[in-house]
């Protein structure tokens, strides 16, 4: 990723896949009821949404959804992303939030943004992101890492170019270079933090894995989606109703702008590394990053 944002190399296929997946997930949800649905009944004030954001939401016609990749062993979100759908401009944008970003939860707690899930589940995750970045998120989609494992295995694995430094950190791998990774190996790869630029390298690997998944999906027949999704739908939890899913799918399928822009928060030059009680944190400057994410999502 560039300093703040860049076009996805496979952006041209994302919107079609996005729409198809939502439709198929809806059908599977109705027929198998494997996907978990969790309604969030909290008012906007308890989700950290202020009056100014409610007005902006209506003016800009943007819907933001929090995507959580959850590590069940740590009971924390290993990855946090905000997907933004602009229904007027007809585009999607993806914002990645660094998991080590410092957020104060208490003197005796782990003060990282990904631990919002640990202390209060998806509701606190939504509230924390809203309050710290002045956003208007009401819904989420959560995927367990076992789900990612199953998705990739269902696709027959993905091809990645592995460095010699990465090989020892991926179970069952014997050589470096281009090769097909299994689901568990791809998860190992996406979670490497000790090679390269720590968490920055890790988010780059996660993006490469996602691009490969999208590439494989684009080459599949629509008739193959139900079998694939039924194998991992039990690992998905969301607060989005089936009616809302259909509405989003309908909107996305009509989008003319076929690229997805990406942003990483905090942006370069607005953060520093710091250790507190021997725990690593990413201290970041709020004003600059709120401005950056608003410029990115709302076009201000």
Show where each model-derived region lies.
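Non-catalytic, solvent-exposed segments at the cell envelope interface
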Residues: 2-5, 11-12, 16-18, 22-300
